């Protein structure tokens, strides 16, 4: 029996105070087990995370998946002792003495002020440097409700130039039932993995020699273009003017925009005629340059410029993930040039647009989560300007009736932002849309954008950076996993396959496909030498929404036997089927 995803996933929480304590405590138990089994192992850090925990080690030999089971057994043996978790507060010198043989702990301790105290947690004979909190006792941990899941590489403090560590991940829950539900979720996630489904469905492939770049095949590019055309139409209806800006722009522009100082490490650089250039990591400076090419009036505002902008970012190879984290991608990017008084109405308008688009792709209002991200430590602009930007966005949220989670310090370097995450079938969050308030980029200190106000004086516009789905590549990866490759008819690269029952009906199958294609439907005829049942299996494996079976009866009646992806088979005339399918596409129906 398959996993009933909707029923099971909603039972689980990613995080809670109780789960964090339990998982944090198990990270300590795992560290004790690893040091017992592999003497000489040095400890780094081990926090709780969504759905589980991890610990980073420097072991005396490489660890592999075969080591996970013995570590689990050792952890259960430690838990059977039932030791309490006991906190001890110590001075910095005392902590350094206690961890004299642990170089990573020593580095952490040395970063603490000499006058500060630190906390240690003891559990039996094991001691770790830790803020806590933990469960009171190992008896509070169900020894059958956790599992070690994987081993990966990691760098100390995330620095690629630092020591390489071994990271062991685990998942932990309050009950065995929750553990088993989570593991079934993970099995389902593996079946839906876009890195497997994408190539299997003929959508794309990835090349190890060219990491972070996607090769789109005909079916995948059909899906890509369908999404792009839909978004283009929606943006046009909402008052956006589409533009296109250069892929390569000079260092001087990136310096003035502030990207050169804040983002240069992630930019691809090139030189020509003794000048430095960069492949654009984002589109905003180009849109400002378009805005500046003529005198703008307050009557021109708000001005909404959109672009399917090709961007590149030099992401670390270890962070690349299928089509969801790549080095070359296209964004449904747009910038709204407006007055400060127009911020609230434009944010409200954008939120309506975003909800409409997400609904068409199959994400209801309750599957959208909003995060309000405020000023980060590394930023441009003064605090007074940031105060105005954050206040304006907060007022816009109130006007739009948005409830949101507050995320201090997670804003863009030039302004605060709202981030919109989609909750997929497996209850995972995917950050997609964003709208960001920017007083910095258009300022005279940066790109110097101006308009003439009602008072006939020059004023600086506010820029709202916004995207609905973000990277098209990433969004397609999300859709593949959300639908398991079984796309709604309007998105399916092939909407129907015509299958003849015997070679005698190949010509009619081709006729049916031609007629339906002429009505702007994506239909193919399978004229291969395979038997009918093999053709049906192939089409089902490719998750085609409709199979159209044709034989003697269908030829005589000029009909097709329609076999939808779900539901019974029935006969329809060609005109009736095309009308039926076109209605599905027009309404963007989610089911065949």
Swiss-Prot record:
GO molecular function: ATP binding; metal ion binding; threonine-tRNA ligase activity; tRNA binding
InterPro entries assigned: aa-tRNA-synt_IIb, aa-tRNA-synth_II, aa-tRNA-synth_II/BPL/LPL, Anticodon-bd, Anticodon-bd_dom_sf, Thr-tRNA-ligase_IIa, Thr/Ala-tRNA-synth_IIc_edit, ThrRS_anticodon
Gene name of the record: thrS
Cofactor: Zn(2+)
Superkingdom in the source lineage: Bacteria
Protein family per UniProt: Belongs to the class-II aminoacyl-tRNA synthetase family.
E.C. no: 6.1.1.3
Keywords: Aminoacyl-tRNA synthetase, ATP-binding, Cytoplasm, Ligase, Metal-binding, Nucleotide-binding, Protein biosynthesis, RNA-binding, tRNA-binding, Zinc
Reactions performed catalytically: tRNA(Thr) + L-threonine + ATP = L-threonyl-tRNA(Thr) + AMP + diphosphate + H(+)
Full protein name: Threonine--tRNA ligase
Organism: Treponema pallidum (strain Nichols)
Enzyme class, broadest EC rank: ligase
